[in-house]
């Protein structure tokens, strides 16, 4: 595994790559290992440069997410949420219920899967909010979630009523 740090407006970001895929992107983590940059990490840093300049870059970085089948499905849905838009945990729970052929699905189960996302920002877990648009649960702190959403043009006053 290769690790390196990226300094961003939301704090230090730790990037992890297996040499072929991005396998981790964590906000606020320090790297105690020797830094090693490969082509995936270099591509990710360029993507982050573009994102933090206010652009909406296409995600063309190979990502490998390790998790349960349920988590994988939730993370796939996260990747479909457009830049600057939000979905509620309930929205994703309803979509998961349809995918799994169930009558309903727990928004809490979805929230737990969202919270385990190992590649934040690129797999945009910050775009998931509470039922009425309230900012809830973000592994890196609600302030960072709010910053990322505002950076993408979202305003809480325009949220779900």
Q: Positions of the model-derived regions?
A:
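Basic nucleic-acid-binding alpha-helical/helix-turn surface characteristic of O6-alkylguanine DNA
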Residues: 1-105, 151-161
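…primarily DNA-binding HTH/wHTH and HhH modules…
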Residues: 131-161
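Short glycine/proline- and charge-enriched loop/turn segments
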Residues: 27-30, 129, 142
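Terminal helix-turn-helix DNA-binding modules in bacterial transcription factors
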Residues: 117-118
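Short, positively charged loop/turn segments that connect secondary-structure elements
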Residues: 97-114, 123
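Short Gly/charged-rich anion-binding patches and loops
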Residues: 73, 109, 144
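Short glycine-rich loop/turn motifs that provide flexible caps or phosphate-binding loops at active sites
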Residues: 10, 53, 66, 83, ...
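Short Lys/Arg-enriched helix C-cap and helix-to-coil transition segments
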Residues: 121-128
């Amino acid at each position: 595994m290769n690790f390196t740090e990226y300094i961003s407006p939301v704090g230090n970001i730790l990037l992890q790559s297996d040499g072929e895929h991005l396998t981790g992107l964590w906000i606020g983590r320090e790297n105690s290992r020797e830094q090693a940059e490969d082509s995936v990490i270099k591509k990710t840093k360029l993507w982050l440069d573009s994102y933090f300049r206010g652009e909406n870059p296409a995600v063309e970085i190979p990502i490998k997410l390790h998790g349960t089948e349920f988590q994988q499905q939730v993370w796939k849905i996260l990747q479909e949420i457009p830049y600057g838009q939000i979905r509620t945990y309930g929205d994703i729970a309803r979509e998961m219920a349809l995918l799994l052929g169930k009558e309903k699905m727990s928004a809490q189960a979805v929230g737990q899967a969202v919270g385990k996302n190992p590649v934040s920002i690129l797999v945009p877990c910050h775009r998931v909010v509470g039922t009425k648009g309230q900012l809830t649960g973000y592994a890196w702190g609600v302030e960072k979630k709010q910053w990322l959403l505002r950076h993408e043009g979202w305003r809480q006053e325009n949220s779900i009523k």
